[in-house]
């Protein structure tokens, strides 16, 4: 009788062992799936946060057209006794920095990565055409612009300096979107109108719009921009806007409706 029960007992133990094994495997797999699901959820949330941050940077809240100043600019184009703002001025998502709409002294965005990438593409295209262009000046801090401007004033006087150099807080270079460009090997025409007459300068003027850049201070527009013609100073605004500004032969101020 005992011998007849032994196979039954062994079989029962084997069945129980199989059930336990199946339960353990199932539980392990289920935990793996849940962990993967949780990780995916975290990744998705991280991506959403990154996208929201990017959108916030590209489309700041203060994008409405600013109120026109009540005062009239002085002989150098600046508003008398103007204090620097606490927030930068954006119009339709475009950052503006000029003699009327300055930047906060604490505004320090560093160089804009999108502008740098577009610049690199433009310089590479120029090199394929035989022009070795280089951006010899880009982002500047408030402190550096202060030193630069003060040196120009000491050398040339304030009235002369105000025609070609921005006061600290008013410089496009502080936006991280502007670059001074010249041709290697022809440094003698850097920062001169003559650069615009060279084949390299003419190529740059003709093709900058294709990469999202505009000549920021064009000829015969000093009364609008506040600065003399600068054949070397280019500002990134994006391809669509750059093409429209170039086609219409207008300045950024005219495009934004602040002149």
Model-derived segments and their meaning:
Residues 2-259:
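Extracytoplasmic cell-surface/polysaccharide-interacting catalytic and binding patches
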């Amino acid at each position: 009788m005992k011998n007849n029960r032994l196979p039954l007992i062994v079989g029962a133990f084997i069945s129980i062992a199989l059930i336990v094994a199946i339960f353990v495997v199932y539980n392990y797999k289920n935990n793996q799936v849940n962990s993967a699901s949780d990780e995916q959820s975290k990744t998705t949330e991280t991506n959403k946060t990154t996208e929201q941050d990017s959108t916030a940077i590209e489309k700041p809240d203060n994008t409405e057209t600013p109120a026109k100043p009540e005062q009239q600019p002085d002989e150098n184009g600046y508003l008398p006794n103007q204090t620097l703002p606490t927030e930068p001025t954006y119009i339709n998502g475009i950052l503006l920095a000029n003699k009327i709409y300055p930047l906060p002294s604490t505004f320090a965005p560093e160089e804009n990565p999108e502008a740098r990438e577009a610049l690199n593409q433009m310089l590479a295209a120029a090199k394929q055409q035989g022009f070795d262009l280089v951006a010899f000046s880009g982002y500047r801090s408030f402190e550096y612009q202060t030193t630069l401007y003060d040196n120009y004033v000491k050398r040339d006087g304030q009235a002369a300096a105000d025609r070609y150099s921005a006061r600290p807080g008013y410089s496009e270079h502080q936006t991280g979107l502007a670059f001074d460009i010249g041709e290697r090997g022809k440094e003698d025409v850097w920062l001169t109108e003559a650069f615009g007459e060279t084949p390299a300068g003419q190529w740059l003027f003709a093709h900058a719009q294709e990469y999202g850049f505009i000549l920021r201070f064009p000829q015969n527009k000093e009364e609008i921009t506040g600065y003399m013609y600068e054949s070397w100073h280019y500002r990134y605004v994006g391809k669509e806007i750059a093409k429209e500004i170039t086609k219409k032969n207008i300045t950024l101020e005219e495009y934004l409706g602040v002149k």
